Amino acid sequence: LDASFIAFPGKTGIIFSSNRPSGTAKAGDTAISYNRYNIFLIDNWNQSEFKQISQLSNLQFGNARFPSQYNTTHFTFVSDENGIGNRYAGFFKSERAGLDTLVFIGDEILRNPRLKEVDSVLSEWGKTDVDSVGFFSVTNDSAYTFPITNYQSSLLETRTAGDNSLVSEVTRQGDYKYLYRLRIDENTLRRRNVTAKPTDY
């Protein structure tokens, strides 16, 4: 959900919200999942069918939605972890971790296989050699997330205006919805001194 393009130093991709159990979970139906929505990043320049998915948030309570790039090293999202929707930011870091090897034998694709596994699949297919070998780059991605607002009423939706350093926020107060246009708050990113305390909600 809520996919948007991001470009950090050393990594570009699509950032999105999902209720998948982790970044390494196998493909499957997440519609019936009971997991919380967290923020994930998938690389978009990798041409192989194995795209690296990195989990950028790990909420204990509530859900994370509406992720987008905040500045060159931070992303932002809305979370109701404390019971009220607040803006959170995450500091993103990526380091090269090396190459993964793909071995293709018939319809089988083996990722970083041991020699014993390759021999077993070769004998299953009645072959003496692999069909082809491929490689793709792998990174170790990490993020540190923290609240940057502590509102009394829930932040319903947000969008980022990219190069203009602006964000929009929609809040509900009583029967009315309010739209705010705000500048990116670099001071709060540096200080990280906002605490979104748990509420009764």
Task: Identify the residue ranges that each predicted region occupies.
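Conserved beta-strand position repeated across blades of beta-propeller domains
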Residues: 4-6, 68-69, 159-160
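A short beta-strand motif characteristic of beta-propeller blades
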Residues: 52-57, 144-148
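Signature of short aromatic-glycine-proline-rich micro-motifs recurring in repeat-based ectodomains
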Residues: 152-165
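Short linear interaction motifs
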Residues: 68, 139-142, 146-149
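Surface-exposed intrinsically disordered loops and tails
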Residues: 127-129, 136-142
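A flexible loop/linker signature enriched in serine peptidases of the S9 family
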Residues: 1-2, 7-47, 57-63, 77-128, ...
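Flexible, solvent-exposed coil segments and beta strand-coil junctions
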Residues: 47-51, 137-140
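Short coil/turn segments that connect the beta-strands within blades of beta-propeller domains
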Residues: 10-12, 72-73, 163-165
